[in-house]
């Protein structure tokens, strides 16, 4: 008898203080998702899965969930549908907690000292439910076909998101490291089967880049465990995902921009974003509309 998973309940809109976004991530992600600056990246439109990612990067979470649900209904055995819906949950929580403020995210001191509103338990439950659903479907697919690259990719994505939740939301660094290690492992397995599954490079790239920011003794210890701590390699893999990836290409481009800001190369970081903005003339009006839809989304989820 196949396993069944309850449909996650709609997260309530928590009463949280208004905050100013110094550099709205929704604006940046709109630029990144629609940009032609990376010529190999196909536009995120045309299928419910593509449309879901485009809506999510636009912070239209209600639309993202709807698109991903359409995909899951049409493809009930595909682990990527539920993994993608989990991404919409974690992006929602990121937005509510201010994690998606690019200038805040690029500054460790400001990020760690920021005020942290309570986590919405409905969002956590929805996220965990979709993670469990995706991992179950991936395990079934691997049992059926040990060379199923998509299944390993799904496990890389779910492990990576759990690392993000542990680090950026729960602040459990050891748990984040364990999940990051799993994400890198599964990504390498997916790439060994399908080298052109460029999105899978993101997990390995982020592991190398983020762990390289630790102090030298910590990098040495992590290196002994097999963790990737090579910053240059991390940047290379992020660029590869940004140029050749699909669903995760916008996120890889964002990480590259954050990297420039973190390294003090403000002008280079801005240059990346300015170059991207030139291919998106509709961005100003679209970003304003997105902010309105995000507020409406939160009220509907009460």
Placement of each model-derived feature along the sequence:
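Short coil/linker segments at helix-helix boundaries
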Residues: 43-68, 77, 88-147, 154-196, ...
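Canonical tetratricopeptide repeat
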Residues: 48, 82, 152, 201, ...
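A cross-kingdom marker for long, charged
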Residues: 258-301
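Bacterial N-terminal signal peptides
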Residues: 24-36
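Solenoid-like repeat scaffolds
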Residues: 71-75, 224-228, 242-245, 275-281
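Boundary at the C-terminal end of the N-terminal hydrophobic targeting segment
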Residues: 37-43
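N-terminal secretory signal peptides that target proteins for export/translocation
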Residues: 1-20
């Amino acid at each position: 008898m196949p396993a069944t998973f309850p449909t996650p309940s709609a997260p309530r809109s928590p009463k949280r203080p208004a905050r100013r976004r110094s550099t709205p991530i929704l604006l940046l992600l709109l630029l990144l998702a629609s940009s032609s600056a990376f010529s190999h990246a196909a536009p995120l439109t045309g299928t419910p899965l593509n449309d879901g990612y485009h809506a999510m990067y636009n912070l239209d979470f209600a639309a993202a969930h709807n698109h991903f649900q359409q995909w899951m209904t049409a493809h009930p055995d595909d682990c990527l549908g539920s993994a993608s819906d989990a991404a919409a949950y974690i992006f929602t929580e990121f937005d509510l907690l201010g994690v998606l403020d690019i200038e805040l995210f690029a500054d460790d001191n400001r990020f760690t000292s920021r005020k942290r509103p309570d986590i919405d338990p409905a969002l956590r439950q929805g996220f965990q439910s979709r993670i469990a659903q995706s991992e179950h479907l991936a395990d079934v697919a691997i049992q059926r076909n040990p060379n199923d690259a998509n299944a390993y990719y799904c496990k890389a994505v779910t492990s990576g998101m759990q690392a993000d939740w542990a680090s950026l939301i729960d602040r459990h660094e050891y748990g984040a490291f364990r999940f990051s290690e799993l994400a890198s492992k599964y990504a390498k397995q997916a790439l060994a089967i399908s080298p052109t599954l460029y999105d899978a490079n993101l997990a390995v790239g982020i592991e190398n880049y983020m762990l390289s920011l630790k102090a030298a003794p910590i990098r040495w210890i992590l290196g002994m465990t097999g963790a990737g701590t090579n910053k240059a390699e991390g940047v290379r893999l992020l660029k590869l995902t940004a140029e050749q990836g699909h669903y995760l290409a916008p996120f890889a481009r964002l990480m590259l921009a954050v990297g420039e800001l973190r390294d003090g190369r403000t002008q280079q970081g801005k240059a990346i974003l300015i170059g991207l903005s030139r291919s998106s003339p509709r961005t100003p009006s679209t970003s304003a509309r997105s902010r309105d839809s995000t507020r409406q989304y939160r009220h509907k989820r009460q």
